[in-house]
Protein backbone atom coordinates (compact mmCIF):
# COMPACT_ATOMS: atom_id res chain seq x y z
CA UNK A 1 0.00 0.00 0.00
CA UNK A 2 1.32 3.39 -0.99
CA UNK A 3 0.66 5.95 1.68
CA UNK A 4 0.74 9.67 1.20
CA UNK A 5 1.83 9.61 -2.42
CA UNK A 6 -1.32 11.15 -3.85
CA UNK A 7 -3.23 14.22 -2.77
CA UNK A 8 -6.96 14.46 -3.43
CA UNK A 9 -7.94 17.74 -5.05
CA UNK A 10 -11.61 17.24 -5.95
CA UNK A 11 -14.07 14.95 -7.67
CA UNK A 12 -15.90 15.36 -10.96
CA UNK A 13 -19.29 13.81 -11.66
CA UNK A 14 -19.35 11.00 -14.23
CA UNK A 15 -23.12 10.75 -13.97
CA UNK A 16 -25.58 8.29 -12.59
CA UNK A 17 -25.75 4.96 -14.38
CA UNK A 18 -28.94 3.17 -15.35
CA UNK A 19 -29.87 0.22 -17.56
CA UNK A 20 -31.10 0.42 -21.15
CA UNK A 21 -32.39 -2.52 -23.10
CA UNK A 22 -33.66 -3.81 -26.43
CA UNK A 23 -36.94 -4.93 -24.80
CA UNK A 24 -38.90 -3.12 -22.11
CA UNK A 25 -37.86 -3.75 -18.49
CA UNK A 26 -39.97 -2.40 -15.64
CA UNK A 27 -39.13 -4.57 -12.65
CA UNK A 28 -36.33 -6.59 -11.12
CA UNK A 29 -38.05 -9.75 -12.34
CA UNK A 30 -37.83 -8.46 -15.93
CA UNK A 31 -34.01 -8.51 -15.73
CA UNK A 32 -33.94 -12.27 -15.06
CA UNK A 33 -31.88 -14.06 -17.68
CA UNK A 34 -30.99 -10.96 -19.69
CA UNK A 35 -27.40 -10.50 -20.85
CA UNK A 36 -26.23 -7.03 -19.87
CA UNK A 37 -22.98 -5.32 -20.78
CA UNK A 38 -21.14 -3.94 -17.77
CA UNK A 39 -17.84 -2.22 -17.14
CA UNK A 40 -14.87 -4.51 -16.56
CA UNK A 41 -15.28 -4.80 -12.82
CA UNK A 42 -15.78 -7.78 -10.54
CA UNK A 43 -18.15 -5.71 -8.42
CA UNK A 44 -20.32 -4.74 -11.41
CA UNK A 45 -20.41 -8.36 -12.63
CA UNK A 46 -21.45 -9.53 -9.14
CA UNK A 47 -24.17 -6.88 -9.07
CA UNK A 48 -25.59 -8.06 -12.41
CA UNK A 49 -25.60 -11.69 -11.22
CA UNK A 50 -27.38 -10.68 -8.00
CA UNK A 51 -30.02 -8.92 -10.10
CA UNK A 52 -30.65 -12.21 -11.90
CA UNK A 53 -29.05 -11.22 -15.20
CA UNK A 54 -25.87 -12.37 -16.95
CA UNK A 55 -22.92 -9.95 -17.12
CA UNK A 56 -21.11 -9.50 -20.43
CA UNK A 57 -17.89 -7.59 -20.66
CA UNK A 58 -18.05 -6.11 -24.14
CA UNK A 59 -15.53 -3.50 -25.25
CA UNK A 60 -17.32 -0.14 -25.09
CA UNK A 61 -16.77 0.63 -28.78
CA UNK A 62 -18.60 -2.64 -29.66
CA UNK A 63 -21.69 -2.12 -27.50
CA UNK A 64 -23.77 -0.66 -30.34
CA UNK A 65 -23.00 -3.62 -32.62
CA UNK A 66 -23.56 -6.11 -29.79
CA UNK A 67 -26.98 -4.59 -29.10
CA UNK A 68 -27.81 -4.43 -32.81
CA UNK A 69 -26.81 -8.08 -33.36
CA UNK A 70 -28.64 -9.25 -30.20
CA UNK A 71 -25.40 -10.49 -28.64
CA UNK A 72 -26.50 -8.62 -25.52
CA UNK A 73 -29.94 -7.57 -24.33
CA UNK A 74 -28.88 -4.31 -22.76
CA UNK A 75 -26.18 -2.24 -21.16
CA UNK A 76 -25.80 0.43 -18.51
CA UNK A 77 -24.43 3.94 -18.58
CA UNK A 78 -25.35 7.58 -18.05
CA UNK A 79 -27.66 9.66 -20.24
CA UNK A 80 -24.94 11.57 -22.15
CA UNK A 81 -23.08 8.36 -23.08
CA UNK A 82 -26.32 6.63 -24.09
CA UNK A 83 -27.06 9.56 -26.38
CA UNK A 84 -23.55 10.17 -27.74
CA UNK A 85 -22.93 6.53 -28.69
CA UNK A 86 -26.34 6.17 -30.35
CA UNK A 87 -27.26 3.22 -28.14
CA UNK A 88 -30.85 4.52 -28.01
CA UNK A 89 -31.21 3.52 -31.67
CA UNK A 90 -30.83 -0.18 -30.80
CA UNK A 91 -31.89 -0.16 -27.13
CA UNK A 92 -34.83 2.27 -26.89
CA UNK A 93 -35.95 1.30 -23.37
CA UNK A 94 -34.30 3.14 -20.49
CA UNK A 95 -34.77 1.81 -16.96
CA UNK A 96 -33.99 4.78 -14.73
CA UNK A 97 -32.83 2.71 -11.77
CA UNK A 98 -29.76 4.86 -10.98
CA UNK A 99 -27.78 1.89 -9.65
CA UNK A 100 -24.38 3.61 -9.61
CA UNK A 101 -22.78 7.02 -9.49
CA UNK A 102 -19.08 6.97 -10.20
CA UNK A 103 -16.95 9.96 -9.21
CA UNK A 104 -13.86 10.88 -11.21
CA UNK A 105 -11.14 11.83 -8.78
CA UNK A 106 -8.73 14.67 -9.44
CA UNK A 107 -5.40 13.76 -7.85
CA UNK A 108 -1.95 15.28 -7.63
CA UNK A 109 1.36 13.73 -6.76
CA UNK A 110 2.45 14.62 -3.24
CA UNK A 111 6.02 14.96 -4.55
CA UNK A 112 4.87 17.42 -7.22
CA UNK A 113 2.96 19.45 -4.64
CA UNK A 114 6.08 19.59 -2.47
CA UNK A 115 8.18 20.77 -5.43
CA UNK A 116 5.61 23.45 -6.19
CA UNK A 117 5.75 24.58 -2.56
CA UNK A 118 9.51 24.91 -2.86
CA UNK A 119 8.99 27.30 -5.79
CA UNK A 120 6.32 29.28 -3.98
CA UNK A 121 4.54 28.24 -0.79
CA UNK A 122 1.23 29.53 -2.22
CA UNK A 123 1.25 27.15 -5.21
CA UNK A 124 -0.24 24.07 -3.45
CA UNK A 125 -3.11 26.18 -2.10
CA UNK A 126 -3.67 27.64 -5.56
CA UNK A 127 -3.76 24.13 -7.08
CA UNK A 128 -6.23 22.95 -4.41
CA UNK A 129 -8.43 26.01 -4.96
CA UNK A 130 -8.40 25.42 -8.73
CA UNK A 131 -9.32 21.78 -8.15
CA UNK A 132 -12.26 22.78 -5.99
CA UNK A 133 -13.42 25.51 -8.38
CA UNK A 134 -13.12 23.26 -11.44
CA UNK A 135 -15.11 20.53 -9.69
CA UNK A 136 -17.96 22.90 -8.89
CA UNK A 137 -18.03 24.09 -12.50
CA UNK A 138 -17.81 20.55 -13.90
CA UNK A 139 -20.64 19.27 -11.72
CA UNK A 140 -22.87 22.18 -12.76
CA UNK A 141 -22.06 21.62 -16.44
CA UNK A 142 -22.50 17.86 -16.09
CA UNK A 143 -25.96 18.30 -14.53
CA UNK A 144 -26.95 20.53 -17.47
CA UNK A 145 -25.58 18.00 -19.99
CA UNK A 146 -27.31 15.11 -18.27
CA UNK A 147 -30.67 16.95 -18.28
CA UNK A 148 -30.20 17.92 -21.93
CA UNK A 149 -29.41 14.34 -22.98
CA UNK A 150 -32.40 12.94 -21.08
CA UNK A 151 -34.70 15.54 -22.66
CA UNK A 152 -33.38 14.78 -26.14
CA UNK A 153 -33.75 11.02 -25.64
CA UNK A 154 -37.33 11.39 -24.45
CA UNK A 155 -38.09 13.60 -27.46
CA UNK A 156 -36.51 11.02 -29.75
CA UNK A 157 -38.95 8.46 -28.38
CA UNK A 158 -36.97 6.51 -25.83
CA UNK A 159 -39.39 4.90 -23.40
CA UNK A 160 -38.27 5.68 -19.85
CA UNK A 161 -39.32 3.65 -16.83
CA UNK A 162 -38.59 5.20 -13.44
CA UNK A 163 -38.56 2.73 -10.57
CA UNK A 164 -41.08 3.16 -7.80
CA UNK A 165 -39.71 3.39 -4.26
CA UNK A 166 -40.85 -0.19 -3.60
CA UNK A 167 -39.17 -1.53 -6.74
CA UNK A 168 -35.98 0.40 -5.99
CA UNK A 169 -35.99 -1.24 -2.54
CA UNK A 170 -36.21 -4.67 -4.23
CA UNK A 171 -33.17 -3.76 -6.37
CA UNK A 172 -31.25 -2.67 -3.26
CA UNK A 173 -32.11 -5.85 -1.39
CA UNK A 174 -31.07 -8.00 -4.37
CA UNK A 175 -27.57 -6.49 -4.50
CA UNK A 176 -26.95 -6.55 -0.75
CA UNK A 177 -24.71 -9.66 -1.14
CA UNK A 178 -22.31 -7.58 -3.26
CA UNK A 179 -21.34 -5.66 -0.14
CA UNK A 180 -20.49 -8.90 1.67
CA UNK A 181 -18.45 -10.13 -1.31
CA UNK A 182 -16.30 -7.02 -1.09
CA UNK A 183 -16.02 -6.99 2.69
CA UNK A 184 -12.45 -5.67 2.64
CA UNK A 185 -13.96 -2.38 1.50
CA UNK A 186 -16.78 -2.47 4.04
CA UNK A 187 -15.61 0.56 6.05
CA UNK A 188 -15.52 2.67 2.90
CA UNK A 189 -18.93 1.39 1.84
CA UNK A 190 -20.33 2.24 5.28
CA UNK A 191 -18.91 5.78 5.10
CA UNK A 192 -20.48 6.28 1.67
CA UNK A 193 -23.86 5.06 2.90
CA UNK A 194 -23.73 7.43 5.88
CA UNK A 195 -22.75 10.46 3.77
Task: Name every feature range the model reports, one short phrase each.
Residues 4-195:
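N-terminal secretory/targeting leader peptides
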Residues 1:
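Active-site loops and adjacent core secondary-structure elements that bind or stabilize anionic groups
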